[in-house]
Regions:
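Extended, folded cores of ATP/NTP-driven motor/assembly subunits in large transport
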Residues: 1-448
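The Walker A/P-loop phosphate-binding site
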Residues: 2-20, 25, 279, 286-287, ...
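The start of beta-strands in P-loop NTPase/AAA+ ATPase cores
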Residues: 23, 118-120, 535, 677, ...
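Helical/strand "switch-coupling" subdomains that flank nucleotide/phosphate-binding cores, especially
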Residues: 82-83, 96-149, 153, 388, ...
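Phosphate-binding P-loop/Walker A region and its immediate neighborhood
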Residues: 290, 421-507, 512, 518-529, ...
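Conserved P-loop NTPase motor cores
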Residues: 491-516, 521-527, 537-546, 558-563, ...
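Conserved catalytic alpha/beta cores of large enzymes that bind or transform nucleotide phosphates
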Residues: 515-604
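Conserved P-loop NTPase motor module
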Residues: 612-717, 782, 816-875
């Protein structure tokens, strides 16, 4: 074992004691959730971050470190989140789901669905007031550098820091094991991402054995501070050997060390490097004698952009983006009111003017000095605009890592350019890489190099960069549906099905062009509903039975062709008679279809005949029986009623409401099976009238409107009898436009009034404009790829996102982009890309997960050349 990056005197709880006499208290913080598509949310995060810096400025310390450290989320923790939303899982309540969750777990373990988070380590130096001599003596172990520091004073300082951190950052003290973890992260950066030690939950007693960790119990590493120089030298020797004859090459090989020394003596600047090679000696093997090597490039920010607003997504947040390499960042902070004073600004301007007069050789030099002076003036103007500015100096350090040194060089150049395009000036310290690496570790005192990189700002101004941030969406428990791709951390987005309505409206809309993955996602949600033994009614009006095909993978489903003589939605069969429900639904469905006014004699006569006592005594338990009774028992309006009913009773497409007659025999269809967990209503043989004058509608079109009303009634009644989540699914219901009453019953009513019963709807459409007023209260929205500018604008606005040209372009060109080498199908691996508004004020870019069952993935595929049609199913 070896020592830490800097010699330690001890580790106790969350306190680091350095041999140089320094004392550091340490806490882990969580980032504030940011919706990057909502300016008001961004402003809120800025205010919260400003509260943190303002509180820290009151602490008696001159050295603060905030380290943004990447941590891998344990697969077990992700599965625990899933299980938390699935009560009864361990007892075998969801047999169909267990196999899928095992597949999901294996994908996480393999790294395919690995998920990460960015934690923030706050380290604050306690003022101890040691002289330089005392610090040196402490390192030489001649004296105890902490002799004059009492445990009581350390505890008091520790408590003051904890109290200063706003609750929204969920601060928790670190442990000695966390120091080992942060060191592991620093040495393994680019090779692997270690799991953070588990922190005891609130009120839970810590494991004392796990808390013990020696100050000299760290893994042994060898740090090559001139990694790129070594590689360059090696390349030179190889090239030289190729140019020599066999004898010369052999001599060069035997005298390699002297050749290297000669090469370095001729090029003395090569002794300083721009890259580190951290060799993890404890992982050595035959292939890697020095152990696995992490190559790291350290960068500092020498100057910020002139307009700091450009820094929001290209500053510290860059480490969470898909930048092609591993990365962390650190902020070394000191608070200094004089740094933003008028006197300091005036002195800076005077110094710059003097330097300008003394050093400028041409107009370009004059321009550079003028730009610097303008920056000072702009900062001073910003400070004056703040009511109570908190002056602070910040040094921003970045570590980029990868196993391949040559690749990392190229990435570092690209990243430096990325910073430059955002207005930042980067500093890749030649010969100072190790110093910068050390500065990104807690317990290490700020160095002169870091002091040189300090930028002057105010707490409010710097908070606008949102250095402590995260973007997470979805529910905190439940089944996995998508990956958060707003950054490269790979958060798994969960859907809490069983408690979906606890937070309010739980309905969902999915919008996407053909081939964007809309129906694939809807079927993913549908599958989970059935896996969790919940109830779903859905309409499938696709002529080839898209959802009928998928229903073959569901455990308890019933496909009901409403024109196919399979079952009955006859209100007199389906609803209870005693409380008047059957009569009410019957009248609501049939009066409009029969063109009977509610104040007509026919309506009154029907009302009397529909009473429970009347029907029960005469055994009128179906509409067909009622029609026959009216025909056989003439009253004043019998002839009129018989004539109106007779037409519909003869139509074959009306079998779901009136029992059909075959060769004079009534076929008594059974009522719709109320026990099925999923009912797929096949309505492909019914066309709906979309005009404004119902009198012009064809008979089948008029009946279709009544049938959809009957389906809505059946769903509402069935769901009202069930405790727990139930949902109505409707894909591409825009064909009902103009039939507001039908849409109200199918969409608006269950969406707005079903929350207390746990009911919600899931609706899909290719175009956002097809979501009418019935969908206005729905907050959870998925939007996938669109193919035209107007459609993209509508989709973004529907999801409560700004339809900027950048987002429209990203929607059209960078969302599941077509692959020209694959017949313009979505690029493999990028299917199902889009955005998700989770209804809680959070929006992020996402990628829909694949079905965890291969058969469901196959049956969900609607690509025209691969789609399985209902008529192809083996019956």
């Amino acid at each position: 074992m070896a020592t830490y990056a800097t010699p330690l005197a001890g580790l106790e709880g969350n306190v680091i004691y350095g041999k140089d006499g320094s004392v550091w208290v340490n806490f882990l913080l969580e980032g504030i959730n940011v919706n990057p598509y909502n300016p008001s949310k961004v402003s809120s995060v800025q205010a919260i971050t400003d509260d943190l810096f303002t509180s820290l400025s009151a602490i008696d310390s001159s050295d603060f470190l905030i380290l943004g450290i990447k941590s891998q989320i344990r697969p077990e923790d992700i599965m625990a989140q899933c299980a938390a939303g699935l009560p009864g899982l361990q007892d075998g309540a969801y047999a169909d789901l267990v196999t899928q969750l095992n597949v999901f777990f294996r994908k996480i373990k393999s790294g395919e669905l690995a998920s990460f988070e960015r934690l923030y380590w706050l380290s604050v130096a306690m003022p101890v007031g040691l002289t330089t001599t005392e610090k040196i003596l402490g390192k030489m172990v001649i004296t105890d550098p902490h002799d004059g520091i009492s445990i009581k004073s350390v505890r008091a300082f520790n408590a003051s820091v904890m109290k200063a951190i706003p609750e929204k950052f969920h601060a928790r003290p670190t442990t000695p094991q966390h120091v080992r973890w942060v060191f592991d992260r620093a040495r393994l950066r680019g090779l692997e991402v270690p799991f953070a030690p588990k922190t005891p939950a609130k009120g839970e007693k810590p494991d004392k054995a796990a808390m013990k960790f020696g100050a000299n119990s760290f893994p042994q590493v060898n740090i090559d501070q001139a990694a790129d120089t070594a590689a360059l030298t090696e390349k030179f020797i190889e090239d030289l050997a190729d140019r020599l004859n066999e004898r010369g090459a052999k001599a060069l090989k035997s005298g390699k060390s002297s050749a290297v020394s000669s090469f370095l003596n001729n090029f003395r600047s090569l002794t300083s490097s721009r890259m580190l090679a951290i060799r993890n000696l404890e992982t050595n093997n035959a292939d890697f004698p020095d152990g696995y090597t992490s190559h790291q490039v350290m960068m500092g920010i020498a100057s910020p952009p002139t307009r700091t607003s450009t820094a929001v997504n290209s500053f510290t947040y860059i480490v969470d983006q898909a930048i092609g390499c591993d990365a962390d960042f650190a902020l070394r902070i000191t608070f200094d009111a004089s740094a933003v004073s008028k006197e300091t600004a005036s002195k800076a301007l005077r110094d710059m003017k003097s330097e300008d007069l003394a050093n400028s050789r041409d107009e370009l030099d004059v321009e550079d000095y003028a730009d610097d002076m303008n920056n000072v003036r702009e900062l001073h103007a910003t400070v004056k605009a703040e009511s109570n500015p908190i002056g602070m100096k910040v040094a921003a350090l970045f570590a980029f890592a990868h196993p391949d040194m040559d690749y990392l060089k190229r990435r570092a150049a690209t990243l430096s350019k990325t910073f430059g395009n955002a207005g930042f000036t980067t500093y890749q310290a030649v010969g100072g890489q190790h110093d910068m690496w050390m500065q990104m570790l807690p317990g290490v005192t700020r160095s002169r190099l870091t002091d040189d990189l300090m930028m002057t700002t105010t707490s409010y101004l710097f908070s606008g960069c949102m250095p402590l941030r995260k973007t997470v969406i979805g529910d905190s428990k439940g089944v996995p549906v998508a990956i958060n791709t707003e950054n490269a951390l790979g958060q798994i987005i969960l859907w809490d099905v069983l408690n979906a309505t606890d937070k309010g409206n739980a309905s969902i809309t999915v919008c996407g062009a053909q081939g964007a993955g809309k129906s694939y996602l809807i079927k993913l949600l549908l599958g989970y509903m059935l896996d969790l033994n919940r109830y779903v009614y859905l309409i499938d009006q696709h002529k080839h039975g898209e959802y009928e095909v998928f229903a073959t993978t569901l455990s308890d489903s019933f496909v009901f062709d409403v024109t196919g003589r399979q079952a009955s939605l006859d209100p007199l069969k389906l609803y209870p008679s005693e409380d008047g429900t059957a009569a009410q639904v019957f009248m609501d469905l049939w009066l409009p279809l029969l063109n009977i006014a509610i104040d007509s004699p026919e309506a009154v006569a029907l009302s009397r005949m529909l009473k429970h006592e009347f029907r029960n005594a005469r055994k009128l338990h179906s509409t067909r029986a009622l029609i026959d009774y009216i025909r056989r028992n003439p009253v004043d309006v019998s002839e009129s009623l018989s004539g109106k009913f007779a037409f519909w009773g003869e139509q074959t497409f009306c079998s779901a409401l009136i029992d059909p007659v075959d060769h004079g025999e009534v076929i008594n269809l059974p009522p719709l099976d109320a026990q099925s967990h999923c009912v797929v209503f096949r309505t492909h043989n019914l066309a709906v009238y979309r005009g404004n004058n119902i009198a012009e509608a064809e008979p089948s079109e008029r009946y279709a409107a009544v049938m959809y009303n009957a389906i809505a009634r059946a769903a509402a009644y069935r769901f009202s009898q069930i405790k727990g989540a139930c949902a109505f699914f409707g894909d591409e219901l825009h064909f009902l436009d103009g039939n507001d009453r039908v849409l109200d019953r199918l969409i608006r009513t269950p969406d707005r009034t079903g929350r207390k019963d746990g009911n919600f709807i899931v609706g899909g459409s290719q175009l956002a404009s097809d979501f009418g007023s019935q969908y206005d209260m729905i907050k959870r929205k998925f939007i996938l790829r669109q193919e035209t500018h107007p459609n993209a604008v509508e989709a973004l606005e529907w999801a409560d996102m700004p339809a900027t040209e950048y987002l429209v372009s990203r929607m059209l060109e960078e969302t599941s982009p077509p692959d020209p080498d694959d017949n313009n199908m979505p690029t493999r691996g990028r299917e199902g890309e889009g955005w998700f508004n989770d209804g809680s004020g959070n929006i992020a870019r996402i990628k829909v997960l694949q079905h965890l069952r291969a058969d469901r993935g196959r049956m969900a595929d609607t690509t025209s050349s691969r789609m399985i049609r209902a008529e192809e199913l083996v019956r």
